[in-house]
């Protein structure tokens, strides 16, 4: 059910860091309420890319996405970039009115750059503001360095979103004073 207080969490995995030369290979979304309770998990989508495109990945991406099985899932996927955008939009429209939720995640500006370049309708659905958990991570590192949130490193989109939500809960409990 749509609620303008719900939050849209998104994570992308890409072939690299440059939205002009690299592409999205996986995406996932989660909807939470304003208290960070998960309401729904959206589709986890491996976006098909050609072997030629995948061969252009640098060593880190080749090793990471190959080791996690993502590269193989991308090769086997039949879902195009446009289909992935449409599926994700259909999901979030069930939960959040247009332009009411900031884009939520970790280092979310990078994801937003890729959405702007490759999935403009989806990028435009978000409010112009960002809810970037990495901002709190940077502030905590400087103002409360004893606070450490331990993250995994699967670099799979759904796992990364779950960790981002857990990390924001951690900072809410231990860093943000009521």
From Swiss-Prot:
<comment type="function">
    <text>3'-to-5' exoribonuclease specific for small oligoribonucleotides.</text>
</comment>
<dbReference type="InterPro" id="IPR013520">
    <property type="entry name" value="Exonuclease_RNaseT/DNA_pol3"/>
</dbReference>
<dbReference type="GO" id="GO:0006259">
    <property type="term" value="P:DNA metabolic process"/>
</dbReference>
<feature type="active site">
    <location>
        <position position="128"/>
    </location>
</feature>
<keyword id="KW-0540">Nuclease</keyword>
<keyword id="KW-0963">Cytoplasm</keyword>
<dbReference type="InterPro" id="IPR012337">
    <property type="entry name" value="RNaseH-like_sf"/>
</dbReference>
<dbReference type="GO" id="GO:0000175">
    <property type="term" value="F:3'-5'-RNA exonuclease activity"/>
</dbReference>
<feature type="domain" description="Exonuclease">
    <location>
        <begin position="7"/>
        <end position="168"/>
    </location>
</feature>
<keyword id="KW-0378">Hydrolase</keyword>
<keyword id="KW-0269">Exonuclease</keyword>
<dbReference type="GO" id="GO:0003676">
    <property type="term" value="F:nucleic acid binding"/>
</dbReference>
<dbReference type="Pfam" id="PF00929">
    <property type="entry name" value="RNase_T"/>
</dbReference>
<comment type="similarity">
    <text>Belongs to the oligoribonuclease family.</text>
</comment>
<dbReference type="InterPro" id="IPR022894">
    <property type="entry name" value="Oligoribonuclease"/>
</dbReference>
<dbReference type="InterPro" id="IPR036397">
    <property type="entry name" value="RNaseH_sf"/>
</dbReference>
<dbReference type="GO" id="GO:0005737">
    <property type="term" value="C:cytoplasm"/>
</dbReference>
<protein>
    <recommendedName>
        <fullName>Oligoribonuclease</fullName>
        <ecNumber>3.1.15.-</ecNumber>
    </recommendedName>
</protein>
């Amino acid at each position: 059910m749509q609620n303008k207080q719900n939050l849209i969490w998104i994570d992308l995995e890409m072939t690299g860091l440059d939205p002009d030369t690299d592409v999205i290979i996986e995406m996932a979304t989660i909807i939470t309420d304003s208290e960070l309770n998960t309401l729904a998990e959206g589709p986890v989508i491996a976006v098909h890319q050609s072997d030629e495109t995948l061969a252009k990945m640098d060593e880190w991406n080749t090793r990471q996405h190959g080791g996690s099985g993502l590269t193989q899932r991308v090769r086997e996927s039949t879902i195009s970039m446009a289909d992935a955008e449409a599926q994700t939009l259909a999901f979030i429209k069930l939960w959040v009115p247009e332009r009411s939720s900031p884009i939520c995640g970790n280092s979310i500006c990078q994801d937003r750059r890729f959405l702007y370049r490759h999935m403009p309708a989806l990028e435009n659905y978000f409010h112009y503001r960002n809810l970037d958990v990495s901002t709190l991570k940077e502030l905590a590192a400087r103002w409360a360095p004893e606070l450490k949130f331990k993250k995994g490193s699967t670099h799979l989109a759904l796992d990364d979103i779950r960790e981002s939500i857990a990390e924001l809960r951690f900072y809410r409990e231990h860093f943000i004073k009521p």
